[in-house]
Amino acid sequence: MENTTRPLKSKISDEANAVLLLTALARAASADTNVSVPELKKVQEIMKRETGHEVVSSDVYIASKSQLFEKVPLEKSVYRWSRKMPPGRRQRLAVEIAEVCKADGEFNDMEAAYFNAMVESLRLTPSQLISIAA
């Protein structure tokens, strides 16, 4: 059986990967229960950079509430997705999630819990996080 899984390129072009990226970022924006304008703009900026497509605010708001409709928890989906990502891309995604969480100038306990769950799902170690923070 041929392996049809291909690694992510520097830009995310696959629609399913783009949806998962939007969901992960939108949930980061709503981790503290509301999506602020700076968080919304940060999600839109990252999506444009990573996918080449503009995302409207309504898409971000819908994705931020997608846990109401999901059959598989986001953490599990991100874990599966991360197995196909090179370590550098996983680290970059962790940074992007942190950027969204901090976009409104705050980083509270709910955002920290979400970030920690995503880092675990991305299979990143503390030393890998230190290397990108330096």
Residues of each region from the PLM?
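Small-residue-enriched hydrophobic alpha-helices in membranes
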Residues: 1-134
